[in-house]
Amino acid sequence: MAESLKGCSVCCKSSWNQLQDLCRLAKLSCPALGISKRNLYDFEVEYLCDYKKIREQEYYLVKWRGYPDSESTWEPRQNLKCVRILKQFHKDLERELLRRHHRSKPPRHLDPSLANYLVQKAKQRRALRRWEQELNAKRSHLGRITVENEVDLDGPPRAFVYINEYRVGEGITLNQVAVGCECQDCLWAPAGGCCPGASLHKFAYNDQGQVRLRAGLPIYECNSRCRCGYDCPNRVVQKGIRYDLCIFRTDDGRGWGVRTLEKIRKNSFVMEYVGEIITSEEAERRGQIYDRQGATYLFDLDYVEDVYTVDAAYYGNISHFVNHSCDPNLQVYNVFIDNLDERLPRIAFFATRTIRAGEELTFDYNMQVDPVDMESTRMDSNFGLAGLPGSPKKRVRIECKCGTESCRKYLF
């Protein structure tokens, strides 16, 4: 038995840092973990809990990484080398002092409630940083994700799993395309109109990868059966998000939002709306539950008929956090790539105008396109953000908080 186990390995359930902390707690050297007699008694600041000033000397109550709260100690500032943590502590302290007392200069001793707030804020930052790392570990796209909350003490959403593509529900099948194009150059020399032409539609992009079709018309991209390669100009949505984006807490009661950290050119692809694909019957059942909770993320796939719905409540990507606006900077398009079932399009967001770095990304939850255009996609009437009021029996009008000049005052 022992012979058969040679060469086997198992994953450790503790992180590298946690193992180092265990060594220091037990006062054990471990060269494999980088713990030697020289650094065995090196301590790392996890966060700062309190502040006081005695005469002209500043002191901080330090929570040490790997040690319980009871082992926290008061340390003079000159003993601390954690510049980033010190700066963040004072930034949080000054912001809260301004909010509470309309002044930013710290007192010689902090009120216990203020000290407790700073501890909760430090713990929140650590939780958000771990969540940010988790999101980036799971993403398959080029664009990085950052997370910020400078508004309240809310941490990562519970029971939300980041996914990069549709999660197919029970009884639903995504059939793979059987054929692809034979083009030498899909943009300039398309054979038989390339993949769009094979479906009797127009080529969607220009040579910069910007959509040139009007909203409501479908996009047919090259697929896994096509002769062309990854750099084909008709492969845009399938390459995923390429902009660095930030999930941030809004300061006007709209919950989480998303802003771009880079400039986005007009008509450029920004992101897909992904989640669980469920039947309309299942969507109706879930919608009644979500109504009672005051939160729902249902998106009808009604390109040709209303058979399926995307539910991003618990499984989704960064689009889960994009807010509504009556004057949005994102527009929805139906996209077909490896699955050509018109009842199951992929939902892609493109920029309606140039979007500046730092600007929030939004789309209209109650989208409308030209009524003569039957190839439309609209949000389900149940769509809403977490925390919005709702009723399982009688739909209430939800007040819009987008704040734009063209605001309709109500989402639905």
Curated annotation (Swiss-Prot):
Sites of N6-acetyllysine modification: 266
Catalytic activity: L-lysyl(9)-[histone H3] + 3 S-adenosyl-L-methionine = N(6),N(6),N(6)-trimethyl-L-lysyl(9)-[histone H3] + 3 S-adenosyl-L-homocysteine + 3 H(+)
Lineage per the UniProt record: Eukaryota, Metazoa, Chordata, Craniata, Vertebrata
Domain Pre-SET: 179-240
GO MF terms, alphabetically ordered: histone H3K9 methyltransferase activity; histone H3K9 trimethyltransferase activity; transcription cis-regulatory region binding; zinc ion binding
Domain observations: Although the SET domain contains the active site of enzymatic activity, both pre-SET and post-SET domains are required for methyltransferase activity. The SET domain also participates in stable binding to heterochromatin.
Gene that this sequence comes from: SUV39H1
Residues noted as binding Zn(2+) 1 in the record, renumbered to the chain: 181, 183, 186, 194-195
Enzyme Commission numbers on file: 2.1.1.355
Protein name (database record): Histone-lysine N-methyltransferase SUV39H1
CC per GO annotation: chromosome, centromeric region; heterochromatin; nuclear lamina; nucleoplasm; nucleus
Residue ranges of the region described as Mediates interaction with MECOM: 255-377
Known partners and oligomeric status: Interacts with H3 and H4 histones. Interacts with GFI1B, DNMT3B, CBX1, CBX4, CCAR2, MBD1, RUNX1, RUNX3, MYOD1, SMAD5 and RB1. Interacts with SBF1 through the SET domain. Interacts with HDAC1 and HDAC2 through the N-terminus and associates with the core histone deacetylase complex composed of HDAC1, HDAC2, RBBP4 and RBBP7. Component of the eNoSC complex, composed of SIRT1, SUV39H1 and RRP8. Interacts (via SET domain) with MECOM; enhances MECOM transcriptional repression activity. Interacts with LMNA; the interaction increases stability of SUV39H1.
Region (Interaction with SIRT1): 1-89
